[in-house]
Amino acid sequence: MNPVIKKFQFGQSTVTLETGRIARQASGAVLVTVDDDVSVLVTVVGAKTADPSKGFFPLSVHYQEKTYAAGKIPGGFFKREARPSEKETLTSRLIDRPIRPLFPEGFQNEVQVICTVVSTSKKTDPDIAAMIGTSAALAVSGIPFDGPIGAARVAFHPETGYLLNPNYEQLKASSLDMVVAGTKDAVLMVESEAKELTEDQMLGAVLFAHDEFQAVIKAVEELAAEAGKPRWDWTAPQANTALLDAIRSEFGAAISEAYTITIKQQRYARLDELREQVVAKFSGEEGQPSGGEVKDAFGEIEYRTVRENIVNGKPRIDGRDTRTVRPLAIEVGVLDKTHGSALFTRGETQALVVATLGTARDAQLLDTLEGEKKDAFMLHYNFPPYSVGECGRMGATGRREIGHGRLARRGVAAMLPSADEFPYTIRVVSEITESNGSSSMASVCGASLALMDAGVPMKAPVAGIAMGLVKEGEKFAVLTDILGDEDHLGDMDFKVAGTAKGVTALQMDIKIQGITEEIMEIALGQALEARLNILGQMSQVIAQSRSELSANAPTMLAMKIDQDKIRDVIGKGGATIRAICEETKASIDIEDDGSIKIFGETKEAAEAAKQRVLSITAEAEIGKIYVGKVERIVDFGAFVNILPGKDGLVHISQISDQRIEKVTDVLKEGQEVKVLVLDVDNRGRIKLSIKDVAAAEASGV
């Protein structure tokens, strides 16, 4: 196959799609190059047959950043890339989410997508290039796929408006970082963080991106027309309508009644009981469907029952209408020895959230393609199996936990104080202790509460809510505060976090095409109503950050010294600063501009370390009295140490009002004496007096 190259203009950039030169044994492979900035190789492989034992669609997406792409060699002992970083995991999820709903229903052949960053100038994020490459590789592969998709990043500035595909530098000045993906006619995925933008501004960004990435879809279609492989001869399995009708006829009413049980565990127990009855009745004998087929049919009846009830205006599973938030229970300060804590309960979803403050040295060191950087804010989300009443695997953090933690982090990050205002490292951990829908948004609420409880000066409290959608034909219902079942059986998962003033995070995943601007507008409006309700209830428990940090938190003292004094504080080989830290049990961070941050487990420890630094960096003040130690005696006087590293001369004439023949008649080495600073010349030499101390003290010096 001869290489096929397609170039197109995407905003300010020229994008090149190339297929047929690299990775030719993959089902589809495309090398995406954006200007001379970034290149990503995307491969897609699809298995020709399905594994019937799996019973689901085994799609896997792997995004990987190779250090050679940025001209670097990996660190560590093995000098090769190890397990995926958090950035790689999040980007893998970002690519997976818009493509998964576009594979046909019933398609269960394994599909693997691998996106490899092979070259980067480190100026822009390669994720959009990887998403474009995924769309193109699927389009040329012949695998059944209802694409192509387009993708774009959007920034926003109040004065200049929306900006397409900003680089890292432009994002720093932006109030918005949003990634949008979708097809020619529909938006399928949104991932964003913002600085309190309005709902209209957020919706405008989504629509702006959808208009702009039409250029991507057009180019991919042209590439597929020229270089695409024949589409697979695959047909969807026929639905067993007779089985569906039989189950609905005999068990439909019981299933519908089960979905009126408001307590999750009781509802699941009743549905399990009905499922067993259905499997026993309709499978097992010769000529009857398999147990798995009957279970799938039962699930289809569940799906249709819940959806029909909702769009026809009946109460939801737990009896609520479409706009009501579940009952809230909010507590702060629930753990005595932590720095800040909160227990946030919304219905059957509960998060125990803990905030911990640390020193600058506790910041996370990130080794990225762009270079090393420090992250002084971490939010970790844990989802133990007991939260849904199950036994399960315990071990490494999963992709879902990383993704939910990042979403919760996006929700609160914009409301944190700057490093200058609050130079602590902050770690928030959300332990999901119960789950029945929207645990990530419970984590946002809990994180805001725990941070305020810890005394972190938040700009404003933050709350989050998850919205859902059920759409049948022209009928639709937007649901506020969805349950787990409504998430699973619905057409949209729409999470919004923000303050009373505006949106700080928006995540949207849509499983169907045909979500209109009107529906998104209604969802954002209902989410605002729910968010304000939750913020109101949170403010009744804690309305603003505590005025003082927790007594358990480390004490931080800030000071600044002359830059030429930095080496005195550090000492030869770090000996001086190490000694201060060991003796006071405090930690000291010194910046190149002379800024010093001192952290102590107690206020006393931090203060002791500060006094040690002050004593090292202090200058002798003319007219001030010091208690010093005689270091050396000479014929014409004595040298007295008044500050660390600073000796002054007491001339023999300044020792006493009486005439002195020999200095040693009055002073001895090691003796402590009070001295008055008479002068400091331009070479830093200090003149001292002992005889004038009494007069100076009498005058109140």
UniProtKB/Swiss-Prot annotation:
Principal subcellular localization: cytoplasm
Catalytic reactions of this protein: RNA(n+1) + phosphate = RNA(n) + a ribonucleoside 5'-diphosphate
EC number per UniProt: 2.7.7.8
Annotated residues for binding of Mg(2+): 487, 493
Highest taxon in the source lineage: Bacteria
GO molecular function: 3'-5'-RNA exonuclease activity; magnesium ion binding; polyribonucleotide nucleotidyltransferase activity; RNA binding
Keywords: Cytoplasm, Magnesium, Metal-binding, Nucleotidyltransferase, RNA-binding, Transferase
EC top class named in words: transferase
GO biological process: mRNA catabolic process; RNA processing
NCBIfam families: polynuc_phos, PRK11824.1
PANTHER family: POLYRIBONUCLEOTIDE NUCLEOTIDYLTRANSFERASE (PTHR11252), POLYRIBONUCLEOTIDE NUCLEOTIDYLTRANSFERASE 1, MITOCHONDRIAL (PTHR11252:SF0)
Protein task: Involved in mRNA degradation. Catalyzes the phosphorolysis of single-stranded polyribonucleotides processively in the 3'- to 5'-direction.
Subunit details: Component of the RNA degradosome, which is a multiprotein complex involved in RNA processing and mRNA degradation.
Family: Belongs to the polyribonucleotide nucleotidyltransferase family.
Protein name: Polyribonucleotide nucleotidyltransferase
Classification of source organism: Bacteria, Pseudomonadati, Pseudomonadota, Gammaproteobacteria, Pseudomonadales
Gene symbol of the encoding locus: pnp
